[in-house]
Design a protein with these regions (language model features):
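Amide-forming acyltransferase catalytic core, primarily the GNAT-like/NAT-type
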Residues: 17-26, 30-58, 119, 123-273
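Conserved acetyl-CoA-binding loop-helix of GNAT-fold acetyltransferases
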Residues: 78, 84-98, 124, 286-300
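An N-terminus-focused feature that recognizes amino-terminal "leader" regions
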Residues: 2, 8-72, 83, 89, ...
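Conserved active-site alpha-helix within GNAT-family acetyltransferase domains
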Residues: 101-103, 113-135, 316-337
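Conserved GNAT acetyl-CoA-binding A-motif
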Residues: 71, 99-114, 134, 303-316
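C-terminal functional modules
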Residues: 299, 303, 307-372
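Residue-level recognition of the GNAT/N-acetyltransferase active site
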Residues: 79-81, 112, 282-283
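A conserved beta-turn-beta hairpin within the catalytic core of GNAT-like acetyltransferases
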Residues: 67-73, 265-277
Length: 372
């Protein structure tokens, strides 16, 4: 625990802090009048987004006298009435201290590129440097199922096969989690799916990842699906009546005349859930087409489970990015990741200081760290 002036930073007490934390979240998420805002429902569990990590901590900042919670860090939130008082900085410093105590060599954060207050806090006051600008790609789930190509076979991999494939092909990708086995075996991971040309492999002829990698087809792609709906739901508020009416009309037409394949707007104006695609990769000239088929398969899975969107996050330089269907107005071209080296004595061997390394073609986004 840390006390500076009238603000105390301490660990969240889930039993006594729940209502105050929920109230703070609501006050921080109120959008500007007349503008569209995105609201998040954590289903009464403030640590739902971090509890699946091997180690996690959530801190709150409260006034020493009134015991009022005025800030928290999971995503960084500070009460509008207590901003510009250094509370965010105190929360970040205390979290970094915990990182160091747990052996972390680096700390990184993600924010929107246009969140100037957040960017300034981390880069100017906390010593972070702008590191990567990945793209968040979001596609709606339509009322109709998507048809997959008859030229492609989609195989469901076991967690052990998926782990073997990921470690042997993607372990050097930036942000690859060392405990990928824990990710794949988590109850929120709905499966890993491999797309191959029809006739090359099938569920009946599949002999494991080792055999596959020793004799791969000309092109293939892989992706895993994470169920964010069980962690949080979202809701778009502030949309005009005209926008709501248009969206409803597209859904009615899609359901009534599915053969028209109308790209309907999902019901985003009431709470909706989503699936997150992670571990996306592949090889070969037609890998992008394979990715497109996997995204269609993921769309149909999301439809079965009542989700409103399917999302992923990839490097801006990702070679397979063009194969990922998405709606531009739902997506974010440039998310911003900032990074800081916590200790000068740390080293990554021949790589050296990671904060100064050039970006690779791909990144591996840990689904446990997906922000609302």
């Amino acid at each position: 625990m840390e006390a500076e002036g009238v603000i105390v930073v301490r660990e969240l007490d889930l039993k006594k802090d729940l209502l105050e934390v929920e109230d703070l979240e609501r006050r921080c998420e109120v959008g500007n009048s007349g503008k569209i805002s995105l609201f998040t429902d954590l289903h009464g569990d403030p640590i739902s987004r971090v509890r699946h990590s091997p180690a996690f901590l959530m801190l709150v900042a409260e006034t020493a006298k009134e015991k009022e919670i005025v800030g928290l860090i999971r995503g960084l939130r500070v009460s509008p009435s207590h901003r510009r008082m250094g509370i965010g900085l105190k929360l970040v410093r205390q979290m970094e201290k915990w990182f160091g105590e747990n052996g972390a060599e680096y700390s990184y954060m993600a924010t929107e590129n246009d969140n100037l207050a957040s960017v300034k806090l981390f880069t100017d006051k906390c010593g972070y440097s702008k590191f990567r600008t990945p793209s968040i790609l979001v596609n709606p789930v339509f009322a109709h199922r998507l048809r997959l190509s008859s030229k492609v076979t989609v195989i469901i991999l076991s967690p052990s096969d998926a782990e073997s494939l990921y470690r042997k092909r993607f372990s050097t990708t930036e942000f690859f989690p060392r405990d990928i086995d824990s990710v794949l075996n988590n109850r929120l991971s709905l499966g890993t799916f491999l797309a191959v040309p029809r006739g090359s492999y099938s569920a009946d002829t599949w002999a494991g990842s080792d055999r596959f990698l020793s004799d791969p087809p000309e092109s293939w792609a892989v992706v895993s699906v994470w169920n964010c709906k069980e962690v949080f739901t979202l809701e778009v508020r502030g949309a005009s009546l005209a926008a709501r009416a248009f969206a409803k009309t597209t859904r009615i037409v899609d359901r009534a005349l599915p053969f028209l394949k109308v790209p309907s707007v999902p019901e985003l104006f009431s709470p909706f859930g989503g699936h997150f695609l992670y571990g996306l990769g592949g090889e070969g000239r037609s890998a992008g087409k394979m990715v497109k088929e996997l995204c269609a398969h993921a769309h149909n899975l999301a439809k079965e489970l009542g989700c409103g969107v399917v999302a992923t996050e990839v490097s801006n330089r990702e070679p397979l990015k063009s194969g990922i269907p998405h709606w531009k107005w739902l997506s974010c071209d440039e998310d911003l990741w900032c990074i800081k080296r916590l200790g000068e004595d740390y080293s990554d061997g021949s790589v050296g200081d990671w904060t100064k390394s050039p970006p690779g073609l791909s990144i591996f986004v840990d689904p446990r760290e997906v922000k609302d």
